[in-house]
Amino acid sequence: MSREMISIKGTRNGLVFFLDPTREFEEIKNTLLSKMESARGFFKGAKFSISHGQKDMPVEQKNELVNICRRYGLIPNNDDAAVPANAVSKASPRATRAASNSKPTIGENALMVRRSLRSGQCISYPGHVVVIGDVHPGAEVISGGNVLVMGSCRGLIHAGAGGNLMAKVVALRLAPTVLSIAGQRYAPEHPSAIPPGCQVARLSGQEIIFEKFQAAR
């Protein structure tokens, strides 16, 4: 089974980009550009570090990757300790239900779920949740912060579960069975009730509204 070229893990110190040391640099660079473009500014303001396993990366190449992330608004974390020695590039299923006492902050405590969620599967996390895949009907995501679905979102989504009124839900295709933000609930009568394309759901007063996603500049 082939290893993912770039995997992303959220830690207390921000995001860590784990690179496959067996792949060519141009492949890694192009994959990073694709991931940044797909995120559409969602990670802007997040701190990040790059881990190349046990293999040393030439400074010029690493700087090139860092500059790509900078262009998309990420902030390099220059502290080498920012990459935990025991960090892993793939979250275990049990980790998706892990609890944390830390208050969710932009760029911190982001759980990356690098797979689609099927009916009956539930992800619960006190910080932000990023699903790199689809959320199918019958699947559920519960987040204390924002929810980003880099795919089609047709399940049950609960953002700002602890009462965070600023929480948002972003999906490339947003057609949830039920969506709630800080306890405010929305259940569309028809899948086409929400406009197509990448949409952002947020609270406006006591109502959930939907807006076309605009990348931060």
Curated annotation (Swiss-Prot):
Function of the protein: Cell division inhibitor that blocks the formation of polar Z ring septums. Rapidly oscillates between the poles of the cell to destabilize FtsZ filaments that have formed before they mature into polar Z rings. Prevents FtsZ polymerization.
Family: Belongs to the MinC family.
Coiled coil (residue ranges): none
Keyword Cell cycle among record annotations: yes
Keyword Repeat tagged: no
UniProt xrefs under Gene3D superfamilies: 2.160.20.70, 3.30.160.540
Keyword tags: Cell cycle, Cell division, Septation
PANTHER family attached to this UniProt entry: SEPTUM SITE-DETERMINING PROTEIN MINC
Protein name, per record: Probable septum site-determining protein MinC
Organism in which the protein naturally occurs: Pelotomaculum thermopropionicum (strain DSM 13744 / JCM 10971 / SI)
The protein's assembly and partners: Interacts with MinD and FtsZ.
HAMAP family, A to Z: MinC
InterPro entries recorded: CAP/MinC_C (IPR016098), MinC (IPR013033), MinC_C_sf (IPR036145), MinC_N (IPR007874), Septum_form_inhib_MinC_C (IPR005526)
